[in-house]
């Protein structure tokens, strides 16, 4: 047993290695940059691991798609602004059936926002960020060891579903340091293996050869250059059913705290850690697989409680999904501006349970003796 002080971002990288990842492409952006730095150092000492610091997030996203098509387990890491730029590539990977992993370490937005302050504003971007009709499988850990484990799950889910999978994190989880035994965790993990034919054997379709993942449809594959609704539907439902089946294997959540209380608090990521001192007063539902929504599981649990309160570091994105799942209104506590504290959680829950507004009072303008703090740069 080797217990070591480990950062959340480092745990993600080590989880990727445990899952068999051999390629990383990325562009530095706070608060995900440690993953890029660690990958760079690892590649320098392990030539079998390939590393690319690309010119931007668009290139990074497309690079991991190419690496995956060539047979590697590949991933990238970014934050909200970079993930916005990657959306076209995410959709392409979904369409072509490319297993790959995107890590989004969220910060306060929109746009540059506050690069060093935590936020959870990309919850719905993951679900509907790209064009088309699909929802990537997405995980959101709340600690270092869990970040390691869900990274392995993310790679396995990507391989099994042949689709991009997202790992969500935030500034606090990414920079959280905890003493954990990741070597012991790795022993209990099982990494999905990539099964490919021998490289170089040409298939019966022009311009295609075995040994890599390729989208063998369309005019480049010798098929008519016309749209066929029936064929599209066949491919779509084949991918959808595979996706649903795989997502069901990773229906991970936590239902705990005081399960006999009459109020259920729904929260995730770092907010669930901040709110933990309230465990004696409330029940907890914490989704770990954040997408697709754990609708059936949550609905069955929520029926046992008088009130459901959703606490999250955004303006109620997940609360919208919770209401759709349980078919009744919920109380909302939005933690905005990067301020995620036990006091804010406590005050917010008390306020909404007493019938008050979701939003706290707007802070006053700073006086001339208290200048406004700079927001920083990305």
Named regions from a protein language model:
Residues 139, 143-178:
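Conserved anion/nucleotide-ligand pocket segment
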Residues 33, 82-85, 107-112, 173-175, ...:
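Short gly/pro/ser/thr-enriched loop/turn and capping motifs at secondary-structure boundaries
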Residues 1-128, 135, 143, 346-348, ...:
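Thiamine diphosphate
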């Amino acid at each position: 047993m080797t217990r070591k002080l480990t950062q959340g971002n480092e745990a993600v990288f080590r989880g990727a290695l445990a899952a068999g990842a051999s390629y990383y492409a990325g562009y530095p952006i706070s608060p995900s940059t440690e993953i890029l730095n660690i990958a760079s150092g690892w590649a320098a000492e392990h030539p079998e691991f390939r590393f690319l610091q690309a010119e931007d997030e668009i290139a990074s996203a497309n690079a991991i798609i190419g690496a995956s098509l060539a047979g590697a387990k590949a991933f990238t890491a970014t934050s909200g602004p970079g993930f916005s730029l990657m959306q076209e590539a995410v959709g392409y990977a979904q369409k072509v059936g490319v297993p790959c992993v995107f890590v989004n370490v969220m910060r306060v937005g929109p746009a540059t926002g506050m690069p060093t302050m935590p936020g959870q504003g990309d919850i719905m971007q993951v679900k509907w960020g790209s064009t088309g009709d699909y929802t990537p499988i997405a995980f959101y850990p709340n600690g270092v060891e869990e970040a390691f484990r869900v990274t392995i799950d993310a790679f396995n889910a990507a391989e099994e579903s042949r689709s991009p999978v997202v790992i969500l994190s935030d500034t606090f989880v990414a920079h959280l340091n905890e003493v954990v035994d990741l070597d012991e965790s790795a022993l209990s993990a099982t990494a999905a293996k990539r099964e490919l034919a021998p490289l170089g054997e040409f298939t019966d379709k022009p311009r295609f050869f075995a040994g890599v993942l390729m989208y063998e449809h369309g005019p480049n594959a010798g098929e008519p250059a016309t749209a066929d609704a029936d064929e599209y539907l066949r491919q779509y439902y084949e991918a959808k059913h595979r996706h649903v089946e795989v997502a069901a294997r990773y229906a991970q959540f936590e239902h705990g705290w005081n399960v006999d209380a009459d109020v259920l608090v729904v929260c995730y990521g770092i907010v669930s850690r901040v709110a933990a001192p309230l465990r004696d007063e409330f029940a907890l539902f914490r989704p770990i697989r954040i997408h697709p929504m754990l609708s059936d599981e949550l609905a069955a649990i929520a029926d046992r409680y008088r009130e459901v309160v959703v606490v999250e570091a955004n303006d109620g994105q997940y609360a919208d999904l919770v209401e759709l799942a349980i078919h009744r209104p919920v109380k909302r506590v939005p933690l905005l501006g990067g301020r995620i504290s036990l006091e804010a959680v406590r005050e917010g829950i008390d306020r909404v349970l007493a019938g008050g507004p979701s939003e706290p009072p707007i802070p006053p303008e700073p006086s001339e003796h208290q200048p406004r703090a700079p927001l920083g740069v990305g």
